[in-house]
Structure formats: C-alpha cells, structure tokens
C-alpha cells in the first residue's frame, strides 16, 4: 500500500514492510527493462533469445498482441518509516540488533526513518548515531542540551549550541534542526543559524 498505519511494533512487521519495499523497487526496475524491451521490439530491432523469452511474458492471450508494460509508480519508489513514541518498548530495548541493522541499511531500500521520542535518550545510542538530522523542541534541561551538543555537534561549543537552541525555540512550537551531514543548524526548516562573533 502507498500508506499504512500499524499500532504495534514488531521486528517481524518491520521486516515485512521492508520486504514489500524491496519488492516494489525490484518491480519498478524490471518494468523499466520490460518497457525498453517492448520499445526495441516495436522498432523491429533484433532480439536475443533471452529477450524473446521475456517478451513472450507480455503476450496477451486474448488479443494475441504484446501489451506494453505499465509502471505502477511514476518514479523509483521511496519510503518513509515513522517510529512514533516507542520509548520504553521492545523496539528500543538494548541489543535490538534487527532494528539497528535495518536503519543502517535503509539507504539500500531507498527508505528514510523518522524516530519521534519524548526524550532523546529513550532512543538507543546505536540508533542515535545513525541520525543525519535531529529536531529538538523546547526544553529547560540544560544538562541534556550540553550532552546533545557534545554527542552530535562537535563543530559547536556547548555554549554556542545552547545559544542557538534558545534562539531557535523562543516561539511556541518552534524547533532547532541539526543537520549533521552539513554541520548546519536551523530554526525550524528554513532559517539557517550562524554564530556571530561578539563585538568588543
């Protein structure tokens, strides 16, 4: 399905979801090859034996004509998996190698994971280390901010990190977004933040 909501997490369910994504990717690639083969046939170009065998899978027995393959998707299928509020559940238990392994390999499945938690440390370190982005909403826990800055933003001092955080979250519902690939910090999605040198 193009979208699905599951109430409970299990490794088996995630495995099924990822397998379905893998099948969709393979179907897309095979259909792309079949379309090229069909077009080659329609131009009366010479076909290999393997191509002829594949072409006959497109033969419509009712019309005795070759049906042009049609893509199910308009482009290579990508997937977003949202893991919401799983802190304290078996999904995040220490040593859940399955979930960590899937997240590590997610790019091969053209999949992005969005992990939403009430507190960053509800998510195991192994998963946190895989994050390319982090969105932090308002908190008064200065110790947490200091730990997060040391763990994730080595290009900023803890003081700079906290200054940016205070600026980014000064309005209700605003958040600080850290892009670890670019070493970039934003207020919400569109305002890139910079540290200004203090004037003497």
Q: Where are the language model's segments positioned?
A:
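P-loop NTPase motor core of the ASCE superfamily
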Residues: 77, 81, 95, 145-200
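Intrinsic disorder/low-complexity signal
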Residues: 15, 23, 33, 50, ...
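Conserved ASCE/P-loop NTPase catalytic core
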Residues: 27
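Conserved P-loop NTPase motor cores
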Residues: 1-13, 31-160
